Amino acid sequence: MALIVGSFAGIELKYIPYKGGKAATLAGLQGEVDIAGGGVHEHVDLVRAGELRNLQQTGTKDITLDNGAVMPTVGNFLPDIKPFLPIGGTYNFIVKRDTDPEVLNEIKEAFVAAAQSDGFKEMMDKKFFQLDIRTGEEADKRAAQLETVTVDTFNRHIPGSL
């Protein structure tokens, strides 16, 4: 994610792979790196405690913490990135393309209902995820968009990595 944001900002970042955002966040906390990327849910406690400063997050909207601190969306600073937000973790439900349309519709209805359930919304709020339900062609288009941006970014910044 940091490389994608850096690419839109026109700045060079040295990519250092970690096994997840929590490990990257700890690397930032320990001074191994100057900028660390990860999911908001992976570093929000350190932001609340004043151990880390959040510069931006890759959701579509600003996030206001219970203490009033605002974690701004990167879209506030880089308007060109807005069509690609949110960038980050997704929950997907995948089926074969030749699945019967009636079955697809039943799955879609169940998936949307589950994603809109109180329990799922509570989990999303707790982890600061933003609900963005896409199905069918809209989901295909979004997946292709994110894949294209990711591949292009990695090819430019880390040639031969993919």
Predicted feature locations:
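Ligand-binding pocket segment of bilobal, Venus flytrap-like solute-binding proteins
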Residues: M1-M71
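C-terminal lobe and pocket-closing loops
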Residues: H43-A115
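Hinge/capping helix and adjacent helix->loop/strand transition within the periplasmic-binding protein
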Residues: M1-A24, V74, T90-M123
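Short, highly charged low-complexity linear segments
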Residues: V33-D34, K61, G88, L146-F154
